[in-house]
A protein has these predicted regions:
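Glycine-rich flavin
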Residues: 24-148
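Intrinsic disorder at enzyme termini
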Residues: 1-11
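A non-catalytic, amphipathic alpha-helix used as a structural packing/dimerization or gating element
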Residues: 11-22
């Protein structure tokens, strides 16, 4: 079995590494100490296509494989945990569920802008929240109702 990275994987790694060093590293300590959301950095993640890496192109994503996603996450996580968590939640918790279980209308309405990271020129990202009193941090024990 060949575990060597492909040329595409190496390009993703270099792009993620450059982004982390040039865009995330400057100010990372200040953002963390001031508890500031890394808005500028997450907007640039969207520009790079890193907010919908494994989502097919017809749904606004980059259509890349899981290895590409993991490589990019590793490079960004080395420098800025806040930016990498935004990337992780959007890609794996939010987009994955919509891609796997959403109908076509939901994919067009929600998944496409989430995978692109923008809607009408504004940041558009998903979130994951544990706030149910009976569940605590046990997500499988939550009970909720969706309202559109």
């Amino acid at each position: 079995m060949d575990f060597a990275l492909t040329e595409e994987h190496l390009m993703i790694r270099n792009a993620a590494r450059d982004f982390a060093r040039q865009e995330c590293l400057p100010g990372v300590i200040e953002r963390d100490e001031q508890q500031r959301f890394p808005l500028e950095q997450v907007m640039k993640l969207a520009d790079l296509g890193f907010l919908g890496m494994m989502i097919p192109e017809n749904h606004g994503g980059a259509g890349l494989d899981t290895t590409s996603y993991v490589i990019a996450m590793e490079e960004i996580s080395k420098v800025d945990a806040s930016v990498s968590v935004c990337m992780s939640v959007n890609n794996s918790l939010v987009n994955w569920g919509l891609e796997k279980y959403g109908n076509e209308e939901q994919k067009q309405r929600y998944l496409k802008p989430l995978a692109m990271g923008k809607k009408d020129g504004r940041l558009y990202i998903g979130a994951f929240l544990l706030s149910e009193p009976e569940a605590g941090s046990d997500a499988t024990s939550q009970h909720t109702t969706a309202i559109d």
